[in-house]
Amino acid sequence: MTNIRKSHPLIKIVNEAFIDLPAPSNISSWWNFGSLLGVCLTMQIMTGLFLAMHYTSDTATAFNSVTHICRDVNYGWLLRYLHANGASMFFICLYLHIGRGLYYGSYTYTETWNVGIILLFAVMATAFMGYVLPWGQMSSWGATVITNLLSAIPYIGTDLVGWIWGGFSVDKATLT
């Protein structure tokens, strides 16, 4: 007589997804950070879009727009805190995902590792652009902190920083 979990049509689906899942037996919680990265990225995009609907980047009104988001927009305070803390969680998951790959020797899979490195550089470039977008996400302070190491390059450091910033548009509390 066959087991009901393998013969019943509905229970068979649950069995194949949870019980008899064809996965290695040594998978631990270290292997879920890729999925958490996707969740964090989705949360960042959604909350960022909703926050951008109410944010103004002008120096005179930026603080008031953030106050408006927190006080007047339904759950605006929650959107703001989810967006701020979601960025930190995203990078924590990213570094743990990379650490897991280093620990388990995933760098031996050259193609996969190279794609991961390209994605890491793309994430870092996107984070930089999130700080210094011309429509006002951050400020001269954010651009300076991120590009400070580049300014130490002899002879070309100062010009390189100015080029990466996009000229001399970085000069106020918000970029407008």
UniProtKB/Swiss-Prot annotation:
Q: Which residue spans adopt a coiled-coil conformation according to this UniProt entry?
A: none
Annotated heme b b566 binding sites? 97
Primary localization: mitochondrion
Record InterPro entries: Cyt_b/b6_N, Cytb/b6-like_sf, Cytochrome_b_N_euk/bac, Di-haem_cyt_TM
**UniProt protein name:** Cytochrome b
The UniProt keywords, alphabetically, are:
Electron transport, Heme, Iron, Membrane, Metal-binding, Mitochondrion, Mitochondrion inner membrane, Respiratory chain, Transmembrane, Transmembrane helix, Transport, Ubiquinone
Q: Any stretches that span the bilayer, and where are they?
A: 33-53, 77-98, 113-133
Quaternary assembly: The cytochrome bc1 complex contains 11 subunits: 3 respiratory subunits (MT-CYB, CYC1 and UQCRFS1), 2 core proteins (UQCRC1 and UQCRC2) and 6 low-molecular weight proteins (UQCRH/QCR6, UQCRB/QCR7, UQCRQ/QCR8, UQCR10/QCR9, UQCR11/QCR10 and a cleavage product of UQCRFS1). This cytochrome bc1 complex then forms a dimer.
Residues annotated as binding heme b b562 are: 83
Q: Which gene encodes it?
A: MT-CYB
Record-linked PROSITE patterns: CYTB_NTER
Q: Where in the cell is it found?
A: Mitochondrion inner membrane
Q: Which family does it belong to?
A: Belongs to the cytochrome b family.
- Briefly state the protein's biological role: Component of the ubiquinol-cytochrome c reductase complex (complex III or cytochrome b-c1 complex) that is part of the mitochondrial respiratory chain. The b-c1 complex mediates electron transfer from ubiquinol to cytochrome c. Contributes to the generation of a proton gradient across the mitochondrial membrane that is then used for ATP synthesis.
Q: What is the lineage of its organism?
A: Eukaryota, Metazoa, Chordata, Craniata, Vertebrata
Instruction: List the membrane topology term(s).
Output: Multi-pass membrane protein
- Give the miscellaneous note: Heme 1 (or BL or b562) is low-potential and absorbs at about 562 nm, and heme 2 (or BH or b566) is high-potential and absorbs at about 566 nm.
Q: Name one GO molecular function term.
A: ubiquinol-cytochrome-c reductase activity
Q: Which GO terms describe its biological process?
A: mitochondrial electron transport, ubiquinol to cytochrome c
Cofactor(s), by name: heme b
Taxonomic source organism:
Eumops perotis (Western bonneted bat)
